[in-house]
């Protein structure tokens, strides 16, 4: 078991260095805090986008070389290696170059001098090394391959060849324009992602994470399989404001996995349930693993519309995981936990209402006031500042204790360290989006998008399902080595236009948001896909289980998540999209949103039925053990409930409403047949 634990440490996260120096630690804290202050400043007083992106990336590059060593050693050092200091200074100077010489570069666009090109090469090399340190080699290697392709285009096989670009042109395009490093991905990191990561960091530091866990356990802990069910709910709540699968697993799993084991779940299943719940946390609006902002920017949609499209799949996904946990609990005969370990439900609920308020302010500003995501995050952060400053004095006043200056200062200290933690979290995202910009820049420089379109069409023909399967496989493979955000940018940039073109060619009028969410979903699933599955390694470390078996079991639980992207790709109503009206669009992408509340409830309800039926088929269990003929009856429930329009298209049903009614009828019939034998011992239930 020690072997497993030692091995797992490599995958949970890239370790930061330890240096026994107060000056070093104070400087890191000050730099991180300064970055957060800068981001809040430009949220209220916007700078030129090129300048703000350059400064944003300079903070990230500098911190990477100060925080992350060339290779990780557990032994602490007394000082920072000289070469890392050189990397830090060179990296910061190079990345700030476009900001310092902004007007000069604007005057000589496309006619760069030697100094511009040398700095560009230096910056790209530094970024590749920063990416290797903070994320591992996968993304830098992919970027290098694209850069090689940019230059050696004429020597490539005919089907992917192009005229090639000079090294000078590549360097200028990638670093001195907004087509590469300083393109849309890092622009979203500057404008949106940082503020929402800071919001999540402040909430966590204030105590919201523990509150969500306590609330979930107070509500569900005493019921059958209570700890596992509470884990699902707590991960969903935490996932709303967390941008990382692994962070979600570690935050919630540290508390829930031991209690799941105590309730009777095996180490593997306890870890796997937390992995599935933690990974799916990235699907939950409003943050959605930070990719929601990039999706909105890529598609020219409002962030609110991206959340609208994601809400039914996210809730269907979590409710079906809750159902799977219930089925596992019934099969294993699990009990709840002693409720005396927790305070009363009402007392726990009331104790953290102030944590829910900033989330409500965020949602109100976005959905009701219809302000920008930047304004919504800024307002919510401001309210959180007040909560953190006054929550300790307020608690003491309520309990009749004396309030002193130290109680107020404690709130300011929490704010400081939350801002430091947010900056450290953002180093990975900022570097990932900068490197992903190189890939996006390569596509615009070489015309690779059209080449890929021809190549995919050659491989898959007109088979749209084959193209989707290839895309899912690509997302899973790349996601094993890339952060979710970078994986989404890479795959969507390469494949999304191809899927849209071929879908429309085959008569499927698919909105772009469906393709982008499809890619996003499978990128997330990579976090629990063996053999890498970083979230699985994190959970395995807590559960003291084998990370591969935890990953396999977690992926098995997440198979229900894997069918959802196919469902909403073909049935856009699952994304609240009525139709795609290209002749008279209601917005820039021609999307007509659903407006009938009853129809929305019907679609949501049937999505739950379809996902529950699929979950029962996976588990072989419903009210009790499923017989073969009952499984046969449940199989058609899944397509009838999730993609009724496809059933109508192929002449299997006269209309969607009839498809829904047949699905509901079959599901109810199987429930009744199961109810009649629910008290029988499992070994007495005949297979047929």
Spans of features found by a protein language model:
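Conserved, well-structured core domains of diverse proteins
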Residues: 1-107, 117-121, 661, 672-674, ...
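Long, contiguous bundles of hydrophobic transmembrane helices that form the permeation core
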Residues: 2-26, 32-33, 308-425, 537-642, ...
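Core transmembrane alpha-helical segments of multi-pass membrane transporters/permeases
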Residues: 129, 133-134, 144-159, 167-171, ...
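Hydrophobic transmembrane alpha-helices that form the pore/transport pathway of multi-pass ion
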Residues: 213-281, 287, 291-294, 300, ...
């Amino acid at each position: 078991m020690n072997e497993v634990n030692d091995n797992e440490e490599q995958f949970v996260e890239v370790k930061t260095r330890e240096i026994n120096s107060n000056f070093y630690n104070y400087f890191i804290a000050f730099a991180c805090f300064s970055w957060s202050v800068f981001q809040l400043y430009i949220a209220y007083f916007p700078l030129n986008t090129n300048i703000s992106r350059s400064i944003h990336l300079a903070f990230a590059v500098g911190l990477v070389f100060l925080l992350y060593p060339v290779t990780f050693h557990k032994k602490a050092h007394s000082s920072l290696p000289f070469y890392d200091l050189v990397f830090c200074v060179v990296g910061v100077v190079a990345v700030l170059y476009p900001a310092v010489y902004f007007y000069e570069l604007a005057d000589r666009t496309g006619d760069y001098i030697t100094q511009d090109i040398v700095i560009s090469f230096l910056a790209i090399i530094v970024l590749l090394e920063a990416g290797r340190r903070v994320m591992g080699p996968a993304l830098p290697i992919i970027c290098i391959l694209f850069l090689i392709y940019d230059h050696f285009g004429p020597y490539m096989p005919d089907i992917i060849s192009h005229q090639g670009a000079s090294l000078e042109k590549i360097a200028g395009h990638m670093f001195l324009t907004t087509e590469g490093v300083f393109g849309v991905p890092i622009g979203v990191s500057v404008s949106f992602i940082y503020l929402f990561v800071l919001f999540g960091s402040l909430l966590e530091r204030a105590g919201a994470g523990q509150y969500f866990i306590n609330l979930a356990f107070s509500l569900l802990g005493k019921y059958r399989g209570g700890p596992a069910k509470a884990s699902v709910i707590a991960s969903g709540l935490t996932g709303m404001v967390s941008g990382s699968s692994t962070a979600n697993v570690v935050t919630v799993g540290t508390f829930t996995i031991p209690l799941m084991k105590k309730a009777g779940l095996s180490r593997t299943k306890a870890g796997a349930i937390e992995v599935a719940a933690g990974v799916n946390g990235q699907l939950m609006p409003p943050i959605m693993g930070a990719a929601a902002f990039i999706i909105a920017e890529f598609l020219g949609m409002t962030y609110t519309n991206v959340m609208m499209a994601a809400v039914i799949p996210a809730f269907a996904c979590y409710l079906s995981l809750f159902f799977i946990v219930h089925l596992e609990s019934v099969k294993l005969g699990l009990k709840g936990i002693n409720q005396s370990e927790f305070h009363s439900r009402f007392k726990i609920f009331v104790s953290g209402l102030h944590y829910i308020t900033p989330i409500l302010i965020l949602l109100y500003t976005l959905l009701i006031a219809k302000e920008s995501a930047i304004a919504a995050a800024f307002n919510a952060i401001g309210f959180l500042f007040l909560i953190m400053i006054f929550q300790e004095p307020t608690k003491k006043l309520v309990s009749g204790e004396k309030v002193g200056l130290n109680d107020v200062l404690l709130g300011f200290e929490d704010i400081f360290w939350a801002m430091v933690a947010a900056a450290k979290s953002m180093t990975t995202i900022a570097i990932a989006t900068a490197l992903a910009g190189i890939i996006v820049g390569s596509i615009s420089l070489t015309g690779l998008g059209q080449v890929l379109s021809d190549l995919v069409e050659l491989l898959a023909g007109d088979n749209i399902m084959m193209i989707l399967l290839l895309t899912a496989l690509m997302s899973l493979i790349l996601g094993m080595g890339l952060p979710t955000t970078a994986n989404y940018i890479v795959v969507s940039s390469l494949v999304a236009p191809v899927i849209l073109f071929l879908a429309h060619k085959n008569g499927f009028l698919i909105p772009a948001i469906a393709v982008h969410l499809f890619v996003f979903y499978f990128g997330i699933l990579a976090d629990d896909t063996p053999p890498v599955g970083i979230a699985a390694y994190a959970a395995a470390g807590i559960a003291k289980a084998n990370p591969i078996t935890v990953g396999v079991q977690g992926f098995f639980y997440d198979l229900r998540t894997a069918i959802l992207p196919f469902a909403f790709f073909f049935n856009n109503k699952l994304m609240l999209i009525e139709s795609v009206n290209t002749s008279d669009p209601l917005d820039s992408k021609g999307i007509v949103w659903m407006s009938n509340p009853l129809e929305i409830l019907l679609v949501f309800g049937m999505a739950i039925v379809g996902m529950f039926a699929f979950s029962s088929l996976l588990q072989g269990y419903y009210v009790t053990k499923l017989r073969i003929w009952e499984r046969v009856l449940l199989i058609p429930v899944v397509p009838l409930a999730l993609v009724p329009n496809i059933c109508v298209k192929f002449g299997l049903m006269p209309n969607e409403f009839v498809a829904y009614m047949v699905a509901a009828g079959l599901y109810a019939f199987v429930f009744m047949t199961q109810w009649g034998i629910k008290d029988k011992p499992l070994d007495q239930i005949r297979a047929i």
